[in-house]
Each structure stands twice: as C-alpha cells, then as structure tokens.
Amino acid sequence: MAVLSLVELCFISIMERMEYNNQALQKIPPQLIERLINFMVYKLPPNHLSLQTISKPIRIKLVRQNRVITMRFSIYNTIDKIIHQIYERIINEEKMEQNEKQKNSSNNNLLSLLTLNNNNQNNNSSIITTTTTTTNNNNNSNCGSSSSSSSSKQILWGSIENYGLFQQSGSFRNARWLQLDKTLAYYEIDSNETLEFKTCKSVLKIRFFGPWERVVHPLHQSTMLDETIKTFVFDESKTVSEISMELAKKLQLKYPEELSLKVQCEEEDDGRGIWLSADLTLPEQGIDPLYTIFLLKRQFFFCKDIIIDFSMDAEMLHFVFCQCLDAIIDTSHPCSPTESILFAALQCQICFGDYVHGSKEIDQIRQRDFLPMEFINQKNILKEILIQYQRLIGMSEQKAKLNYIQLAKSLKTYGYTFFKVTNRQTSIVNNNLSSSGGSGNGSGSGNGSSSSSSNSSSGNNNNHNHHNHQQLFGISSEAVLTLDPMTNNTISLYSLSNIRKWHVLNNVFTIEYNDRKDTFISMEAEAISHVLSSYIHHNLRETPSIQKQWDQNYLSVSGRNSLTNGRKRLSTCSNCSSDSMEFDSSKSNTKDKDWKYQYGLVIKKCALYIEPKKLYINPLSTQITGSMVNKELNKDTKVTKVLKVLTDLSSKMILSFSKSSPAKEREIVVKFSDKKVKSFVVDEQKTVSEITQEIGLKLGIKNPEEFSLQLIVNNKNNNNNNNSNNSSTSSSSSSSVNNSGIFDGLNNSNVNNVFYNSYIVNSSISNNSNSNSNSNILNNSNDEQSTSTSTSSSLGGIWLKPYQPLSEQSISPDSKLLFKKKFYTSDIGAADDCNSDPVYFNLLFFQSKDAIISNTYTCSKEEAIQLAATLFQINFGDHNPNIHKPGFLKSQDLKFFLPPNSLELWGLSFQKIEKSIYKEHQNLRGIKEVYAKYRYVQLCRSLKTFGAIFFSVRQLLPNKTNGSSSSSSNNNGGNSNNGINGNGIITGGNGGSGGGGSGIGGNGSGINTGGNGFGGSQQIPINQPLVLGFSRKCILFMTAKTKKFLVEYPLTHLRRWAYHKDTQCLTLDFGDYEMGRIVLQTTESEEISSYLSDYIDYIQTKLVGSQSFSRSIFNSDNNSSSFFSNSFCNNTTTTTTTTTTTTTTTTTTTTNNV
C-alpha cells in the first residue's frame, strides 16, 4: 500500500505540473508507467470491465456426430477454454446416454427373471436366492462397464489436443481455424453463424520426384525411381512453415528450416509451382488439402558453407546431390541448354555407370527425369547428351556427384529462390522528382494530372524496356537478381544493402532500391516478401554489428536513452501504414497534402481501416535517413502506445478529482419505439451519451450505450419553414432540401430525375448554403409528394450529437426526443435471449418492425411473408380457419404488415398475398407471443440490411464539368473531367483496368492523385438515385427505386472520408483498395459524416477498448516486458489512426484556404 500511495502522489503531482503534455510524460520511466496504469485500473476501473461477464450463445456443429448444439460462452474466454468446455459436455452427454442404456438393459434382465419366478413356483427359495445374486452380479458388472465405457468414450474421441474450432469462409475472408490463445471477442462471430468442432488432423499429399525418393530410401541408389505421392497426417491448424518443418523431421531431412511447400499450378506446365505463404494456414489461403497435391521444395539457402570434396560423408554427399538435381530439373536454378546437357550426362554416369553401346536403359530413359521442362522438346538434345556421356567413362559415382554439385554451384543462379513475375513498371528514383503518378490497383499503370489557374501538378512514369513481360525474380542471402527467362540474361542485380523498402498490395510487389523502383505482378507476392524478410532477418542475426548500429540509430533519433533496458529488440522488417512513411520531405504525398487545404473541406480518418499495402523497411540499407527512422520506429513503439493510454487515463483521473459544477436540470419528453412516452428530469450540461445511458439504466437496459436520442421533426413546421425560405431567397442561388428530398439531376437540368426517400429513417433538416458561384439546386417537394414523407418523420428524426451537452443542441422545451437503438455490432448483448433483457428486446422488436414496414430493412417476397405471418401470430394468436379467411384483411391493412408498394413491386394481387400469409400463419400454431417476437427479431437479423441506416446519394458524373480541371488516363487513352464550381472535389478519368488519374482542385489549387481512379466504383451507376447504407460491418449501395443491392464494402476498407458543405459532396476514400475514391452528391453529407464518426467511435470503444483496458491484460504478476507486449500490440498495429479516448476516436481537420 505504501508503494501505491507514493505512486498516486507522484502521478497527481506530475499531472498538475506538466499540464498533461505528451512530451513531458515521455520522461517518465517505463517501470513507473507500468505501476501507474496498474494503480489506475485498480482504483478507477472503467465501465467496460463489467462487460467481461457478457456471454454469447454460439452454435457448434459436432462434425463427428453430425449434429448442432448451442452453448453460451463468455466473450473473454480463450478459444482453448471453449474447446475444453465443448469436449467435456460431449463426454458427459455420452456417459449419460451409456448409463441410461445400461439401466434399461438391467431393468429388462430383472423383468425376465421375475417372469421365470412366476413360472417356477415350486422352487421359490432357490429362485429368490439366485435372483438376488444375479442382481448383485449385474450391478457389479454395471459399475465396471460404466468405468470402462467412460474411458472407451475418451478413447473413441481421442485426445482433446486433436480438436479445434473451424470457421467457414465469410463475405470478406477465407475459412480459418480459431487460434487457441485468442478470445471470443477477438473474432466477429454472428449469432446465425455456426462453428465446426472437429479434428485438426487431415491428410496431406506430397509428390516426390526421383531424387527425394532416394533420400528417403537410401538402399535404392543405383536406379532412378518414378515420381510417387506420399500421404501424411498433419495438423491443419498449423501454418505452412510449421507443416514443412514437421514433414522434414518425419522424412529425416537435414536443414528443415530451408524447406517449404508449393502448389502445382494447373495453368502452367513447367513444373515450377507456386510458393505458399509461410505464415498462413492452408484454409486461410483457400486451399483444401484433400483435393490438392503439394511439393516439398528447398526455399532457402542458409547453409552454403558446406565443403564439397572426397572427405564428405556418403549420406551427406547424396543429400546435397539430390538437392542440386531437384533444383536443376524443376528449373529452380535456371541454366542454359549447354549446361543442362552436362548435368544430364553426369546424371547418366551416376545412374547407369560407364557408357555401354546399345544399352536398352539409355534408349528408354525419360527426358523429363534428366532435363528441365523447357529443353525436353529440343531437337538432337539426346544425341548431345550421349556424346558427353561417352566422355565420362571411368568416372566413379562419387566423383560424378562431386562434379555435379560443383557445376551446380558454379551457376550464377545457385543459391537463389526464383519467382515468376511480370514487370509492370520501372522508374528511376531521383531526388529532384516532385510527385510521380501512382499506379492503379488493376493491371495497368496510370498517370494522373490536374491543373487550375494558380497551381498545376503532373505525374510522370519513366518506363524502361523491361516491363510488361515475364521475368524471373531471384532472392539469395546476399543479393536480388532479375533474369530474362528466355535467355537467362541478367536484367538487374542488387545487394540486399541497396534495398530501401518494399511493399505488397494484393498481387503487386514493389521494391525500391537506392536508384530505381520496380513493380511486379505475381501470384507469389506474399511469398516473395516472406523470403526477402527471412534472408534479411538471417543476416541481421549473423551480423550483430549491424543490429547494434540499427539500435543506435533508433536511440539517437528517438532520444529515449533511458528506455534501453525496458525495450526489446526491434523486428527486422516492421509493418506500418504507407501514409506515415516518408523518406524525404520533398517526396511527400502531394495528393493528401493539397486535399487538406481545400476551403470548407472537412476530412476524417477511419480508425477501423486495415492497410492492404504492407510496407517493410530494410534495416540493412545503407541509405537510411534520420527522418525515415524517426517516422518508422517511433510510430509503433511500445512506449508510445503506453503514453497514449496514460494520457487517456490521466484525463479520467482529472475528472474524478475535479469538482463537479452545479447541475442544470430540465425535463425532456422521450418517445420509445413501442409508442410509449415518458418524461425524465436530466442535467442539460451532460452530454447526450451520458443522458442516454441514464435513461437506459432507469429502464433496466443492460446495454444502454447502443441507444441514442433523435429529435422528432414535425412535418408541418418543416413545410412552413421551407416555404418561408423560398420566399426570402438570397442574391445567389442556394441549395436546400426538406424531408422528402426530391433530387434534381446534377448537371442535367433537362432530365427530370426524381426519387423519394420516404424510407429513410433519419431525415435531415433543410440545409441552406449560399455561395458566390452557381450551385446545384435541390428543389423543395411539391404538395403531391408531401404524403410520402409522413411515415419517415414519424419513424425517425435527427440524431443528436452524442458528445455535446444537451444545452448546446438548440432543443426547444416542447420538442420530443426519440429513444432508439443506434449501434449494431456483432450481436453481443442480451438481444440473443428474450428472457435475459426483456426491455431491450421489446424495444428492439418494435424498432425492427417499424424498419420492415417502412422498407428500411429491405427483404425478399418470401422473407416479407414470413415476417407478416409472424406479426399475425403476435397480434391474432393461432390460426383460426373460421376467422382468418379471405376477407378478414382489407387492402389498406397491408401497410401494418408489409413494406409499402409491395404489390406493385412483386406483381401480385392482394388475394394471393393474403392467401400466402394465411398459409404461413398456419405453420406457427402453438407459438406464444414472446417467442413469436423472438422469431421476428431473428428473421430481421438474417437480413443483410439489419441495423443499417440509409441516406439518399448520387455518384457524380465524371463526364461533364463546370470547373477548370483536367485528368488523363494512361490505360485506354480516355480523358474525363468533372468539376463543381472550382471548389468541390473533382474526380479523374475512369481508366481501363484499375488505372486512370483523378484530380482534386479547389480555389485555384490543383493536385495529382495518380492512378486511384474509379476502379471499384464502376459497379455503381452514375448520376442515378442511390441509397447509401451503413450496417454492422459493411457499406452498402442500393438503387433507390427497386432497392437492389449493387455492391458492399467492409468498414475496414474505408480509410477516410470528407464532406463539403457548400457543394454538398461526400468523398469515401478506400485507400489502396480497388475501389479508390467514390465521390457522392448528397444533401446529408454532414449527417452522414457525423453518423459514421459516432459508429466507428462506438466500435472502437466497445471492441478495441475493452481489450486494451482489460484486467487480464494489466496483470500485476507479469513482467515488464510481457506487460508492454501484451497490452498494446494486439489491435493498434492494424489501424491507421489509433486513439484510446472514449469520446473522439476519429480525427477531424478543418482547414482554410491557403
């Protein structure tokens, strides 16, 4: 207690004197930081620590028994613990079944004995004694059999170590095995998803060629064996590197760390195959081992210092010979035709001995066992092999093997691991280059340009002759080699110390040297990065002087010499976001820099963004500058992460010690989704989020943070306001919109494109903006369409800002607020069980019903009929054929059960719809009201649009222009322009296959964005009414009229977004993903940005924050090193922007005109 009190006093004094400055906090020793955080978590436990008791039902499929069970687990249990719980339940259930069977069999035996007693009345005494003894014997046998059956059941299921949990593939990922050390909260598992409990053991088929067979069977060294396929039992949940190590140990091969697995490509005939990613499992790479044949090959050449002479052991000599022979035949070491003839002649001498004229063995040899695949069909090559074979008469087998190995080592390709690549782009790295056009995400490269009256920026790509054709990219422990596969001529050769960095994006591998940069396309991009990182890591371990210099550079730049003892050794190749990496300030990203200086543009970053471009820094590089080391190493250090947490916790400490100001109470009227209205007295100085949680706790809701408040908008007041706005127009044109939102065509005034947003839950207030230039006008609705908005205003309103006090949001005393569920995460909470939280469940049911009836949650005809029949069961009970018959419903009654305009959309008559509802209603006989509501909610959960909130948008047309901007596309030669009064966001050309440029200009500033273009947005129609929705995991695009799904993108692909009030534009930036940037026109741009910020902040607080501040992480028994590594390395490395505050996760930047 004395230490804690001392730490408390020190921390309070630090906060008072340093004014909570990060630079001052960096001077705190790491040991004191650890004690401070442990103390603060102990004294001030965050609210989310109570979430550790949250349990979640999971459906488990027992593959062995082919049945599905449902079990409830804590979301903070590890997968290993969950597997043990499932295994124990299975064993216990089978024990109970076995005991019941034994009990029934013993009862049957007693009944048979009793019947014998009745038949033999003359011998009662003897029969009774025998009966009792028999019964005792049966009981004894039952006890023995029960113990043996329990052990037999465990033997039948096998060891628990052989089982795991398997998750099938989803929308944006492959199938995977759940890792044992991860928690259930780490994985996003929906309530309707089923996990498979099955054995991890599977069958792996490895194809071995002749040389490898001779290594396995050394007795058959005199003859060549045909290629065979061997089957091994392996653990499917292990990575490829672990599998290859186990296989090498089973085969008793030397140097198992040099081996890896390949997959034979069906499209190629050269036998080269494709290297698998070593750090992933087979299911994560989309490979089914039951239907795939693998190759076990040598991938690394770490051990090259073997002395090749006659003193070698015979087994070692044969092993090295087989490795060289295998590499020559499968073209892992490319060679010329002359060299291949010499190799084949030496191989004949080893296999057949001295040359004998007219030997049948030589005439019947298969050329593919002696020659690479590319030389088999050459003319007269067999005659040339025989000529060289005759010259080797008298050479022993050992001498021939030595010559074969020496000849293989003399090749310039020996020791290299080669990959087949396509060179897409080669550029010269020049210090005077201003900005270079980026390459598109597709197969082409793009040059983007944008110009304006003040500034101009252009992008150029300096391409060389060696691009857009096949090449061989080789990596060794010393250098990187690029060859022409036809002639084996050297294209480029660089040592590893001349490599500055490289990054991987999908199947694109880009490597940057000191004087040039190459971009390749390859199916083995991840394997190339892995081999290069492994060689650098190996060299770094072998040369500790380089590691020491690397650490000194880090310490000299960071200036934290006091943290040397508590810091672990840095990894050789660190992974980070490409945006934060700058080797030189003159080569900064001009696109992002100029985007920030547009007048009136608000930019926000998405903290959930996962960078697809994996950027690696080479510590062996001799050109490391101080700025690079500072940018790279200070980004993800453990101390920086600790300081971020410390800053957040210090603010919580300040709030706890500060005196609260006197409350200003006021009464608010709150309406709920079940149509009930209640009054609450709240403190208007508190934020909306705090008030919402207070209301939720008063109602008895366990998860009040998922709810928020909306301001109910009155239709009549809005119409009056809009009419008054129209009467008092300004000198320039203004843009305004009311709740119904008739959207006139952008840059297309001749065409009357009109759509309604009557199904939009959150209608926006009229947003008037005046500008000096001509702007697009969104007209008010006519009286004809005013009826279509009655449902929208009754269902929802305007979301209040959650982190602002209630007094600052201009809420009139007579206004009504709507208490609604706003956030839908991965089904964690009490909604899965209608009995655990009835208030929460009841509100969720009514909100889901309103969303279905208002067509917010779009569904098919079959789904809508099931939902309508369930509502029938809730309202009218079981089906009664005397009452529920044609004529019971009227056509106007369908609006209470089905979405609007359902008859026109499906092309059915009222009688057919009514008959279908009655037919489905009959199947629900006997279901009580509460379970019918639960069924209704579960049906809604299965919809793709469940939990989504939609907004009316249009994608901008990239053909017409009003501003002065230009862009060019290099793929198809097409040019396209688009501008919005010179102030907005100007999109670039479409480009052919992922290429194309895009420009952004505003107020005389133009920039170049390279080849982002509109790669993925081509699936979205341009200048047509669309619906943009944000669901639990995805960003949805739908057509406004037919509600047809167009495309969906995961939230983790959204890098950032920006909106412009004057031009009413919203830009979704997907970073390096194929979608690029999507520019939308909407009157609700600010509302969309606010909602998206709140949603991402909630996800960060709920999921990421709960793991960052868990008591299991801040364990006082752990050491300092494990404390730093466990608490901050899990979730922060995959996000672009990491913030730990519970109030503002996203970063907002508002800049003025430069």
Curated annotation (Swiss-Prot):
The record's section on SUPFAM superfamilies has: PH domain-like, Second domain of FERM, Ubiquitin-like
Gly residues bias spans: 437-447
What phenotype is described for loss of this gene?
Loss of FrmA leads to increased cell-cell adhesion and results in impaired multi-cellular development, slug migration and fruiting bodies. Mutants show increased adhesion because of an increased number, persistence and mislocalization of paxillin rich cell-substrate adhesions, which is associated with decreased motility. FrmA null cells are unable to efficiently sort to the apex of mounds and form the organising center known as the tip. They also show a delayed expression of LagC.
Q: Which UniProt keywords apply?
A: Repeat
What GO biological process terms does the UniProt entry carry, in alphabetical order? actin cytoskeleton organization; cell motility; cell-cell adhesion; negative regulation of cell-cell adhesion; negative regulation of cell-substrate adhesion; positive phototaxis; response to cadmium ion; sorocarp morphogenesis
Which ranges carry the FERM domain? 218-547, 666-1103
Task: Quote the biased-composition stretches of kind Low complexity, using this chain's numbering.
Answer: 448-463
Among Gene3D superfamilies, the record links this protein to:
1.20.80.10, Phosphatidylinositol 3-kinase Catalytic Subunit, Chain A, domain 1, Pleckstrin-homology domain (PH domain)/Phosphotyrosine-binding domain (PTB)
* Triggers of expression: By starvation.
**Pfam families (alphabetical):** FERM_f0 (PF16511), FERM_M (PF00373), IRS (PF02174)
Q: What task does this protein carry out?
A: Key regulator of adhesion dynamics, it acts as an anti-adhesive. Plays a critical role in the regulation of cell-cell adhesion, multi-cellular development and, in particular, the formation of the organising center known as the tip. Required for turnover of paxillin-adhesion sites during cell migration. Plays a major role in normal cell shape, cell-substrate adhesion and actin cytoskeleton organization.
- Specify the protein name: FERM domain-containing protein A
Give the organism the record lists: Dictyostelium discoideum (Social amoeba)
